[in-house]
Amino acid sequence: MKKVLLSLTMLAIISTPVLAKSPVANLKINGDIKPPTCTINGATQSDVLFDYGRISPSLIPQSKIYSYSGIVAHNVVTVECDAKTYLTFVASDTYGDTKLSVNNTSEWFHLVDKSNPENAVGAADFIWSDATVDGKPAFISRANDVAITGKAYKNVLYKGPIYGWTSEQQSDVDKNALALISGQVFQSNFKHGNANSNSNGNSNGTFILSKDELSKKGIDLSNGLDFIGEAVLTFNFGV
């Protein structure tokens, strides 16, 4: 047996210079599946500031809330990723555990006294518009994984449920039924709600409690009031 193998090997060596070498094409495949790295407005964690400016304490009504209906505070949020992905997010309220006597539903993100953040002094809401994926028109849709309270609008930000950039407008659907769009650049304009509610999805607008309600919390407006609020959007790649 060994002699036979040796003979074949020698024959192959002797014959090699005589045979024409066949061309070879190597069809190689390279790929990489891993979570993408994304930035929000150019940073891994970005603070998007909505500045309502300064108003006089005299504008706050004695027994009714003060509504910021005359201003338009808005910002563009851009999420850029280094690989194609689906993108969803969930909104939470940093000061959501503070007590608020009015408009205490899912769309309201609490505003608190900066010097005493245990005291809620009002609330803000947000709506979005002009959603895009890779520069093409898209929608932001809401899943029904978390029940919302208050009126249901298509483009209002609520605390709890999953949202995602989709190819069609969807509301209150199973999270696995969201028609998510894959892309690398996700963008939307966020602004505070409009004081005049309508069927297009505008909500009631940012507000400050009345002087009477603030007084119950030990807040004297004659000394001025600095307030803060924070809606946190936590992004995820898919549902």
Enumerate the predicted regions with their spans.
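Gram-negative bacterial Sec-dependent N-terminal signal peptides
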Residues: 1-21
